[in-house]
């Protein structure tokens, strides 16, 4: 039996969200006397990291998200450059709205100077979002703290596993931000966290008060050798992850 790409993705997403439910469908017919229990409310807001479409233009990206029934995107600068004019930003939002997609954040944006931090915060303000996914140099964190207070934004540091020295895992982000403004936290990339030898489920539980965004992926190994693979075929325990997301009220 053949399935369309849309059917494949929608069935896969539905299956993933059902993993954390408290009841399992039973083969027996429901009792005709007892009223049916209300359906569980899905608390999650499923979005897409703009970087996923690094090799695709904005039109293709938005058409794909619409087909997949995904309505949120983290805006990457190759789709909306940091030096965009206000008119270009309005046109970007209009195009997103035509496909029922909303930009909820910008990034990841790498920041190696105070000037680059200033530019990123100004960009986010003009775009109209309150969350920046960023990667600042360690020594710039006090300046990020200052800007978060000034703009009243949340700032989620994207962790990168063993591939680069800065922010390899959730614990590293926590240790560098725990004494800063509580609006500074992390984008928990569960694949990279595992690739650095960590347990993303345990890390979500420990650090959930500072988890402002998540990148969901599966990987083949809990080491630098791990590479991306279809969800369910790798090493991440997704039923446990979904249960933990519910437990800590991550939405």
Where are these regions (language model features)?
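Residue-level recognition of beta-strand->loop/alpha-helix junctions
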Residues: 52, 76-77, 107, 159
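Short secondary-structure boundary segments
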Residues: 77, 136, 218
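Histidine-acidic metal/acid-base catalytic patches
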Residues: 2-45, 54-71, 170, 175-188, ...
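Active-site acidic/histidine proton-transfer and metal-coordination neighborhood
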Residues: 12-13, 20-21, 38, 59-62, ...
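Glycine-rich, proline-tolerant flexible connector loops at the mouths of alpha/beta enzymes
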Residues: 74-91
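A short, flexible beta-alpha/helix-coil linker loop
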Residues: 80, 162, 221-224
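Short, well-ordered beta-strand segments
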Residues: 47-49
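Non-membrane alpha-helical structural segments and their capping/turn regions in soluble enzymes
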Residues: 86, 90, 114, 118, ...
